[in-house]
């Protein structure tokens, strides 16, 4: 990842940019206003009733904890990647794969022995749940992500060891949950700009299609289409505080995009999706006080 001081040419000088580049910047700045409004506005929500799936038991310093893994078609599915592709991402500590899930509030329950315990309901997409039923790998991954999500959200410290209940699909009663009913607006599909006026020439590197969207108020995601590549070998990625630079092997691709948001380059991660031939970039955003 590049330091922002390394990526600091004077892109603000419109006299040094071509007409297409200026249009490129104007589209981004216009979309930035929509994003800022989305960050400050309270998102619309809808109420869902998750369906039971399976229940796992673990514990914290305060006693037994049960996690009801539930599902709902209203939860968006994760990206369609194979287990081999996902395993490669995890082995390389990449953050190109996310499992959308809804983390419910804690509710007090009684276990099989009549002793007090705490239960949490965690909902994932119904179609993804069906896929997870046939995969021990996905099941363990979902439980791990759910446990870590509950720890972050509620300040818990849960035992990473857990076991799945054999004869109960949930503990207690599964409550309704509120989820965002609208996706946040995409910034801009930058690849829709006229390719004939792209930053390169017909004999130079191709500028790939770039898609950006705000996944959460503090997380910007990018997808870069690289159909001529079979993997990440030779691919160069540099991320500054407000800039994304990508270079391909044999000078096949070059992208130099200014983003009207402040990126935490140190925490950014990327993964190459072999089947879709896309580079997926996860970029946490800096707060105003950073």
From Swiss-Prot:
Q: Which GO terms describe its cellular component?
A: cytoplasm; nucleolus; nucleus; pre-snoRNP complex; R2TP complex; RPAP3/R2TP/prefoldin-like complex
Q: Which residues are annotated with the PTM Phosphoserine?
A: 12, 16, 173
Q: In its keyword annotation, does this UniProt entry include Transmembrane helix?
A: no
Marked site positions, Interacts with TELO2: 57, 64, 113
Sorted alphabetically, the keyword list is: Nucleus, Phosphoprotein, Transcription, Transcription regulation
Keyword Transcription regulation found: yes
Main localization (coarse): nucleus
Q: Which InterPro entries match?
A: PIH1/Kintoun_subfamily (IPR050734), PIH1_N (IPR012981), PIH1D1/2/3_CS-like (IPR041442)
Instruction: Choose any GO biological process term that the UniProt entry carries and state it.
Output: snoRNA localization
Q: A single Gene Ontology molecular function, please? A: phosphoprotein binding
Record localization:
Nucleus
Q: What is the effect of changing residue 57 to E?
A: Abolishes binding to TELO2-phosphopeptide
Q: Which PANTHER family match?
A: PIH1 DOMAIN-CONTAINING PROTEIN 1
Oligomeric state and interaction partners are given as: Component of the R2TP complex composed at least of RUVBL1, RUVBL2, RPAP3 and PIHD1. Component of the PAQosome complex which is responsible for the biogenesis of several protein complexes and which consists of R2TP complex members RUVBL1, RUVBL2, RPAP3 and PIH1D1, URI complex members PFDN2, PFDN6, PDRG1, UXT and URI1 as well as ASDURF, POLR2E and DNAAF10/WDR92. Interacts with phosphorylated TELO2. Mediates interaction of TELO2 with the R2TP complex. Interacts with phosphorylated ECD, EFTUD2/SNRP116, RPB1 and UBR5 and with RPB1 in a phosphorylation-independent manner.
Q: What does this protein do?
A: Involved in the assembly of C/D box small nucleolar ribonucleoprotein (snoRNP) particles. Recruits the SWI/SNF complex to the core promoter of rRNA genes and enhances pre-rRNA transcription. Mediates interaction of TELO2 with the R2TP complex which is necessary for the stability of MTOR and SMG1. Positively regulates the assembly and activity of the mTORC1 complex.
Q: Which family does it belong to?
A: Belongs to the PIH1 family.
Q: What is known of its domains?
A: The N-terminal region is required for binding to phosphorylated substrates while the C-terminal region binds to the other R2TP complex components.
Protein name as it appears in the record: PIH1 domain-containing protein 1
Q: What is the lineage of its organism?
A: Eukaryota, Metazoa, Chordata, Craniata, Vertebrata
Gene field: Pih1d1
């Amino acid at each position: 990842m590049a330091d922002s001081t390394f990526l600091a040419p004077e892109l603000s000088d419109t006299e040094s940019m071509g007409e297409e580049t200026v249009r490129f910047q104007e589209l981004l700045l216009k979309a930035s206003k929509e994003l800022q409004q989305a960050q400050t506005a309270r998102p619309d929500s809808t109420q869902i009733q998750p369906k039971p799936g399976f229940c796992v038991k673990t514990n914290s310093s305060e006693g037994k904890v049960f996690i009801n893994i539930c599902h709902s078609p209203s939860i968006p599915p994760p990206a369609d990647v194979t287990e081999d592709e996902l395993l490669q991402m995890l082995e390389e500590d990449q953050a190109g794969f996310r499992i959308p899930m809804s983390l419910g509030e804690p509710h007090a329950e009684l276990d099989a022995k009549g002793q007090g315990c705490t239960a949490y309901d965690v909902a994932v997409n119904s179609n993804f749940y069906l896929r997870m039923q046939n995969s021990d790998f996905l099941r363990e991954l979902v439980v791990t992500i759910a446990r870590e999500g509950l720890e972050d959200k509620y300040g818990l410290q849960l035992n990473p060891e857990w076991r799945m209940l054999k004869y109960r699909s949930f503990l207690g009663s599964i409550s309704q949950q509120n989820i965002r009913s609208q996706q946040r607006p995409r910034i801009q599909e930058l690849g829709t700009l006229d390719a004939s006026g792209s930053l390169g020439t017909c004999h130079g590197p191709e500028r790939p299609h770039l898609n950006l969207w705000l996944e959460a108020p503090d997380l910007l995601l990018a997808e870069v289409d690289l159909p001529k590549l079979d993997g990440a070998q030779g691919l160069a990625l540099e991320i500054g505080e407000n800039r994304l630079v990508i270079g391909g092997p044999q000078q096949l691709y070059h992208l130099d995009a200014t983003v009207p948001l402040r990126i935490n380059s140190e925490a950014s991660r990327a993964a190459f999706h072999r089947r879709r031939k896309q580079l997926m970039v996860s970029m946490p955003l800096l707060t105003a006080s950073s």
